[in-house]
Amino acid sequence: MEFIINKINNIKNNNDNNNNINNNSNNNNNNNNNSNNNKFKFKYEFEFGYCYDVNLYEWRFIQDYETVPLKLNGILSNDEYNSILNIIGDVYDKTDKYPHVTYLLSIIMMVLLCMLPSVMAIHSNLNSYIQFVLFDDIFILITFILIPFLFFLKKKVIIENNYVIKGLKNRSIKLNIEYYKFKLLYFFFLLLWVPQGFLQSLIYKKRVLNEDFFNLKISLFILLGIDLIFILFAIWNFLLFTKLNRFLIKDRRDENILITLNSNIKKFLSPMEFYLTCNNTLNFFLNNNDNHFFPIDLDDPNV
Protein backbone atom coordinates (compact mmCIF):
# COMPACT_ATOMS: atom_id res chain seq x y z
CA MET A 1 0.00 0.00 0.00
CA GLU A 2 2.81 2.38 0.89
CA PHE A 3 4.45 1.56 -2.38
CA ILE A 4 1.33 2.64 -4.29
CA ILE A 5 1.03 5.88 -2.28
CA ASN A 6 4.70 6.71 -2.87
CA LYS A 7 4.27 6.00 -6.57
CA ILE A 8 1.30 8.36 -6.77
CA ASN A 9 3.22 11.08 -4.92
CA ASN A 10 6.16 10.69 -7.27
CA ILE A 11 3.87 11.03 -10.26
CA LYS A 12 2.33 14.21 -8.77
CA ASN A 13 5.76 15.67 -8.07
CA ASN A 14 6.88 14.93 -11.61
CA ASN A 15 3.76 16.59 -12.99
CA ASP A 16 4.34 19.63 -10.79
CA ASN A 17 7.92 19.87 -11.96
CA ASN A 18 6.86 19.58 -15.59
CA ASN A 19 4.25 22.30 -15.08
CA ASN A 20 6.87 24.55 -13.51
CA ILE A 21 9.21 23.94 -16.42
CA ASN A 22 6.44 24.72 -18.92
CA ASN A 23 5.50 27.87 -17.04
CA ASN A 24 9.10 29.00 -17.00
CA SER A 25 9.50 28.35 -20.70
CA ASN A 26 6.27 30.25 -21.41
CA ASN A 27 7.50 33.15 -19.33
CA ASN A 28 10.78 33.12 -21.21
CA ASN A 29 8.94 33.12 -24.52
CA ASN A 30 6.77 36.01 -23.38
CA ASN A 31 9.84 37.92 -22.27
CA ASN A 32 11.51 37.27 -25.61
CA ASN A 33 8.41 38.43 -27.46
CA ASN A 34 8.23 41.56 -25.35
CA SER A 35 11.90 42.28 -25.96
CA ASN A 36 11.41 41.77 -29.70
CA ASN A 37 8.45 44.13 -29.67
CA ASN A 38 10.35 46.73 -27.68
CA LYS A 39 13.26 46.33 -30.02
CA PHE A 40 11.40 48.19 -32.76
CA LYS A 41 10.05 50.96 -30.57
CA PHE A 42 11.76 54.27 -31.16
CA LYS A 43 12.99 56.49 -28.36
CA TYR A 44 13.18 59.48 -30.66
CA GLU A 45 11.32 60.31 -33.82
CA PHE A 46 12.45 63.00 -36.24
CA GLU A 47 10.17 64.42 -38.91
CA PHE A 48 10.50 66.86 -41.76
CA GLY A 49 7.68 69.38 -41.53
CA TYR A 50 6.25 71.49 -44.32
CA CYS A 51 6.70 75.24 -44.53
CA TYR A 52 3.41 77.14 -44.46
CA ASP A 53 4.92 80.58 -43.86
CA VAL A 54 6.35 82.18 -46.99
CA ASN A 55 8.68 84.33 -44.88
CA LEU A 56 10.44 81.25 -43.50
CA TYR A 57 11.45 79.50 -46.72
CA GLU A 58 15.12 80.16 -46.05
CA TRP A 59 14.78 78.05 -42.90
CA ARG A 60 13.81 74.89 -44.70
CA PHE A 61 17.29 73.60 -43.94
CA ILE A 62 18.28 73.64 -40.32
CA GLN A 63 21.50 74.97 -38.85
CA ASP A 64 24.93 73.43 -38.72
CA TYR A 65 25.48 70.77 -36.12
CA GLU A 66 27.34 73.20 -33.85
CA THR A 67 24.37 75.60 -33.72
CA VAL A 68 21.53 73.11 -33.58
CA PRO A 69 19.36 73.59 -30.47
CA LEU A 70 20.91 71.80 -27.48
CA LYS A 71 22.94 69.86 -30.08
CA LEU A 72 19.98 67.48 -29.97
CA ASN A 73 21.17 66.55 -26.48
CA GLY A 74 23.88 64.42 -28.04
CA ILE A 75 21.32 62.09 -29.60
CA LEU A 76 22.79 62.49 -33.08
CA SER A 77 26.48 62.45 -33.82
CA ASN A 78 28.01 65.02 -36.15
CA ASP A 79 28.32 62.42 -38.94
CA GLU A 80 24.72 61.31 -38.53
CA TYR A 81 23.54 64.90 -38.56
CA ASN A 82 25.52 65.61 -41.75
CA SER A 83 24.07 62.44 -43.31
CA ILE A 84 20.58 63.78 -42.69
CA LEU A 85 21.55 67.12 -44.22
CA ASN A 86 22.90 65.29 -47.27
CA ILE A 87 19.57 63.51 -47.66
CA ILE A 88 17.80 66.86 -47.60
CA GLY A 89 20.35 68.32 -49.98
CA ASP A 90 19.58 65.62 -52.55
CA VAL A 91 16.22 67.27 -53.13
CA TYR A 92 17.10 70.95 -53.42
CA ASP A 93 20.10 73.19 -53.37
CA LYS A 94 20.38 74.46 -49.82
CA THR A 95 20.97 78.00 -51.04
CA ASP A 96 17.73 78.10 -53.02
CA LYS A 97 15.24 80.29 -51.25
CA TYR A 98 12.39 79.42 -53.62
CA PRO A 99 12.13 75.65 -54.09
CA HIS A 100 9.14 76.02 -56.41
CA VAL A 101 11.27 77.76 -59.03
CA THR A 102 13.94 75.07 -58.89
CA TYR A 103 11.32 72.35 -59.14
CA LEU A 104 9.53 73.91 -62.10
CA LEU A 105 12.72 74.59 -64.06
CA SER A 106 13.87 71.02 -63.45
CA ILE A 107 10.57 69.66 -64.76
CA ILE A 108 10.74 71.85 -67.88
CA MET A 109 14.30 70.76 -68.64
CA MET A 110 13.40 67.12 -68.09
CA VAL A 111 10.37 67.22 -70.40
CA LEU A 112 12.29 69.03 -73.14
CA LEU A 113 15.10 66.50 -72.94
CA CYS A 114 12.76 63.53 -73.10
CA MET A 115 10.88 64.97 -76.09
CA LEU A 116 14.08 65.50 -78.12
CA PRO A 117 13.72 62.28 -80.17
CA SER A 118 10.17 63.24 -81.17
CA VAL A 119 11.31 66.68 -82.27
CA MET A 120 13.97 65.09 -84.43
CA ALA A 121 11.47 62.66 -85.90
CA ILE A 122 9.04 65.43 -86.83
CA HIS A 123 11.83 67.41 -88.50
CA SER A 124 11.65 65.59 -91.84
CA ASN A 125 13.44 68.18 -93.99
CA LEU A 126 16.83 66.63 -93.28
CA ASN A 127 18.26 63.99 -95.54
CA SER A 128 17.22 60.54 -94.30
CA TYR A 129 20.83 59.33 -94.07
CA ILE A 130 21.79 62.38 -91.99
CA GLN A 131 18.77 61.75 -89.77
CA PHE A 132 19.77 58.13 -89.31
CA VAL A 133 23.42 58.81 -88.48
CA LEU A 134 22.67 61.85 -86.35
CA PHE A 135 19.99 60.20 -84.28
CA ASP A 136 21.79 56.89 -83.81
CA ASP A 137 24.91 58.63 -82.58
CA ILE A 138 22.96 60.85 -80.19
CA PHE A 139 20.84 57.98 -78.91
CA ILE A 140 23.84 55.70 -78.29
CA LEU A 141 25.74 58.50 -76.57
CA ILE A 142 22.87 59.53 -74.31
CA THR A 143 21.91 55.93 -73.54
CA PHE A 144 25.42 55.09 -72.37
CA ILE A 145 25.32 58.21 -70.21
CA LEU A 146 21.83 57.62 -68.81
CA ILE A 147 22.14 53.95 -67.93
CA PRO A 148 25.02 54.50 -65.45
CA PHE A 149 23.16 57.54 -64.15
CA LEU A 150 20.08 55.40 -63.49
CA PHE A 151 22.14 53.03 -61.37
CA PHE A 152 23.80 55.95 -59.62
CA LEU A 153 20.41 57.52 -58.90
CA LYS A 154 19.09 54.26 -57.50
CA LYS A 155 22.20 53.80 -55.35
CA LYS A 156 22.26 57.40 -54.16
CA VAL A 157 18.58 57.90 -53.42
CA ILE A 158 17.32 54.49 -52.38
CA ILE A 159 20.28 52.45 -51.14
CA GLU A 160 22.46 55.07 -49.43
CA ASN A 161 19.61 56.98 -47.82
CA ASN A 162 17.99 53.78 -46.61
CA TYR A 163 21.36 52.80 -45.14
CA VAL A 164 21.34 56.01 -43.08
CA ILE A 165 17.72 55.49 -42.03
CA LYS A 166 18.36 51.89 -40.96
CA GLY A 167 21.46 52.96 -39.07
CA LEU A 168 19.42 55.50 -37.13
CA LYS A 169 16.72 52.88 -36.54
CA ASN A 170 19.23 50.63 -34.83
CA ARG A 171 19.80 53.45 -32.35
CA SER A 172 16.05 53.82 -31.72
CA ILE A 173 15.86 56.95 -33.87
CA LYS A 174 13.18 57.20 -36.52
CA LEU A 175 13.58 59.48 -39.54
CA ASN A 176 10.48 60.21 -41.61
CA ILE A 177 11.10 61.45 -45.16
CA GLU A 178 8.50 62.22 -47.83
CA TYR A 179 10.34 63.11 -51.00
CA TYR A 180 10.79 59.83 -52.84
CA LYS A 181 7.90 60.67 -55.14
CA PHE A 182 9.90 63.62 -56.40
CA LYS A 183 13.10 61.70 -56.98
CA LEU A 184 11.42 58.62 -58.45
CA LEU A 185 9.68 60.94 -60.90
CA TYR A 186 13.05 61.61 -62.52
CA PHE A 187 13.82 57.91 -62.46
CA PHE A 188 10.52 57.18 -64.24
CA PHE A 189 11.17 59.63 -67.07
CA LEU A 190 14.73 58.48 -67.55
CA LEU A 191 13.41 54.94 -67.93
CA LEU A 192 10.94 56.16 -70.55
CA TRP A 193 13.76 57.73 -72.51
CA VAL A 194 15.42 54.39 -73.32
CA PRO A 195 12.45 52.60 -74.98
CA GLN A 196 11.53 55.81 -76.76
CA GLY A 197 15.00 56.16 -78.20
CA PHE A 198 15.15 52.48 -79.12
CA LEU A 199 11.86 52.65 -81.02
CA GLN A 200 12.92 55.85 -82.74
CA SER A 201 16.15 54.18 -83.83
CA LEU A 202 14.20 51.27 -85.31
CA ILE A 203 12.03 53.70 -87.23
CA TYR A 204 15.07 55.39 -88.75
CA LYS A 205 16.53 52.03 -89.72
CA LYS A 206 13.23 51.14 -91.35
CA ARG A 207 13.32 54.31 -93.40
CA VAL A 208 16.99 54.12 -94.40
CA LEU A 209 17.68 50.38 -94.60
CA ASN A 210 14.11 49.34 -95.48
CA GLU A 211 14.29 46.39 -93.10
CA ASP A 212 11.11 44.48 -92.22
CA PHE A 213 12.11 43.04 -88.86
CA PHE A 214 9.48 44.91 -86.88
CA ASN A 215 6.01 46.36 -87.22
CA LEU A 216 6.36 50.05 -88.03
CA LYS A 217 2.79 51.00 -87.09
CA ILE A 218 2.96 49.37 -83.66
CA SER A 219 6.28 51.10 -82.96
CA LEU A 220 4.87 54.45 -84.00
CA PHE A 221 1.81 54.02 -81.76
CA ILE A 222 3.99 53.10 -78.77
CA LEU A 223 6.27 56.04 -79.47
CA LEU A 224 3.35 58.46 -79.73
CA GLY A 225 1.93 57.06 -76.48
CA ILE A 226 5.19 57.77 -74.66
CA ASP A 227 5.30 61.27 -76.15
CA LEU A 228 1.71 61.83 -75.05
CA ILE A 229 2.73 61.05 -71.47
CA PHE A 230 5.42 63.73 -71.70
CA ILE A 231 3.03 66.28 -73.19
CA LEU A 232 0.25 65.67 -70.64
CA PHE A 233 2.77 65.83 -67.83
CA ALA A 234 4.10 69.16 -69.09
CA ILE A 235 0.57 70.59 -69.34
CA TRP A 236 -0.35 69.29 -65.89
CA ASN A 237 2.74 70.89 -64.35
CA PHE A 238 2.02 74.16 -66.11
CA LEU A 239 -1.49 74.20 -64.65
CA LEU A 240 -0.14 73.19 -61.26
CA PHE A 241 2.26 76.12 -61.19
CA THR A 242 -0.11 78.70 -62.65
CA LYS A 243 -2.28 81.04 -60.61
CA LEU A 244 -4.70 83.55 -62.18
CA ASN A 245 -2.87 83.38 -65.54
CA ARG A 246 0.36 84.57 -63.91
CA PHE A 247 3.40 82.35 -64.25
CA LEU A 248 5.38 81.38 -61.19
CA ILE A 249 8.72 82.86 -62.24
CA LYS A 250 7.13 86.18 -63.10
CA ASP A 251 5.42 86.64 -59.73
CA ARG A 252 7.42 84.33 -57.54
CA ARG A 253 7.56 86.89 -54.69
CA ASP A 254 3.80 87.18 -54.49
CA GLU A 255 3.05 85.65 -51.09
CA ASN A 256 -0.46 84.51 -51.99
CA ILE A 257 0.80 82.67 -55.07
CA LEU A 258 3.64 81.04 -53.14
CA ILE A 259 1.31 79.90 -50.39
CA THR A 260 -1.07 78.42 -52.98
CA LEU A 261 1.80 76.74 -54.80
CA ASN A 262 3.13 75.32 -51.58
CA SER A 263 -0.28 73.86 -50.82
CA ASN A 264 -0.55 72.34 -54.31
CA ILE A 265 2.91 70.81 -54.17
CA LYS A 266 2.22 69.28 -50.78
CA LYS A 267 -1.11 67.92 -52.00
CA PHE A 268 0.04 66.43 -55.30
CA LEU A 269 3.76 65.69 -55.14
CA SER A 270 5.07 66.37 -51.62
CA PRO A 271 8.63 67.17 -52.69
CA MET A 272 9.47 69.86 -50.13
CA GLU A 273 10.88 69.70 -46.62
CA PHE A 274 11.11 72.51 -44.13
CA TYR A 275 12.68 71.79 -40.77
CA LEU A 276 13.70 68.91 -38.55
CA THR A 277 11.71 68.30 -35.38
CA CYS A 278 12.12 65.71 -32.70
CA ASN A 279 9.09 64.19 -30.99
CA ASN A 280 8.92 62.30 -27.70
CA THR A 281 11.93 63.26 -25.59
CA LEU A 282 12.89 66.53 -27.31
CA ASN A 283 10.38 69.11 -28.47
CA PHE A 284 11.02 72.44 -30.17
CA PHE A 285 8.99 75.28 -31.52
CA LEU A 286 10.04 77.88 -34.07
CA ASN A 287 9.79 81.52 -33.04
CA ASN A 288 8.51 83.40 -36.09
CA ASN A 289 10.00 86.71 -34.93
CA ASP A 290 13.67 85.85 -34.82
CA ASN A 291 13.70 82.47 -36.60
CA HIS A 292 15.28 80.48 -33.79
CA PHE A 293 14.44 77.16 -32.24
CA PHE A 294 13.67 77.00 -28.54
CA PRO A 295 13.13 73.87 -26.43
CA ILE A 296 9.72 73.25 -24.90
CA ASP A 297 9.58 72.11 -21.29
CA LEU A 298 6.66 69.69 -21.25
CA ASP A 299 6.60 69.80 -17.43
CA ASP A 300 6.01 73.53 -17.46
CA PRO A 301 2.31 74.15 -16.59
CA ASN A 302 2.33 77.23 -18.81
CA VAL A 303 3.07 75.21 -21.94
Curated annotation (Swiss-Prot):
Keyword Transmembrane belongs to the record: yes
Protein's name according to its UniProt entry: Putative uncharacterized transmembrane protein DDB_G0285385
UniProt keyword Membrane, yes or no: yes
GO CC annotations on file: membrane
Membrane topology, record value: Multi-pass membrane protein
Major subcellular location class: membrane
Transmembrane domains' residue ranges: 102-122, 132-152, 184-204, 221-241
Subcellular location, record wording: Membrane
Keywords linked to the UniProt accession: Membrane, Transmembrane, Transmembrane helix
Organism: Dictyostelium discoideum (Social amoeba)
Superkingdom of origin: Eukaryota
